[in-house]
Amino acid sequence: MYIAFEGVDCVGKSTQIELLKKCFKDAIFTKEPGGSELGVHLRKILLESKMQFSKKAELLLFLADRANLIDIHLVQNKNKLIISDRSFVSNMAYAKFDFDQNILFDLNSFATGGFFPQKIVFLHGSKELIEQRLSKKNLDSIEKRGVEYFLNIQNALEETLEILKTKIDIKILKLDASLSIENLHEKIKEFIND
């Protein structure tokens, strides 16, 4: 089973994934971007570089990472539990302001070969929560875009998930990121085991 965690920065995806590593020791854990050697380099370029990219170039770099990760690492483990920090859903949500959703879905279908998550854990945060957590960290180039940007992305994630429910067989668990870490963890484990 392939499970992806979605949500904007600072909603606790990484925290929950770290907790799951203790419960599901045989699972494959990955992230997008950066789940493969190519992805590590692309992530560094995209998030830390001072280089400027066109929106189309940025989209294609994310797609290249996804294609490589899925073809080389995930498909061969498709019969295992795979847990990913982000997936094509983020790509579609982040790019929806610049590209048609149908084109984005088709590009992601091509890049993934149709290998999509069966379950999505969507962590949703309030403006106050995101603001508070962003203020406590060193920001990368995307995080520097600010709270309003992340609220727009969060709305785009929700819209994208609604669209995807009509296109692919997917189960979605939406959780309030302000719940306690333990409460979130229990709900997520139950969803995975269901």
From Swiss-Prot:
Its EC number is 2.7.4.9. One of its GO terms (molecular function) is dTMP kinase activity. GO terms for biological process: dTDP biosynthetic process; dTTP biosynthetic process; dUDP biosynthetic process. Keywords: ATP-binding, Kinase, Nucleotide biosynthesis, Nucleotide-binding, Transferase. ATP binds at G7, V8, D9, C10, V11, G12, K13, S14. InterPro entries: P-loop_NTPase, Thymidylate_kin-like_dom, Thymidylate_kinase. It comes from the Bacteria. Phosphorylation of dTMP to form dTDP in both de novo and salvage pathways of dTTP synthesis. PANTHER family: THYMIDYLATE KINASE, UMP-CMP KINASE 2, MITOCHONDRIAL. This is Thymidylate kinase.
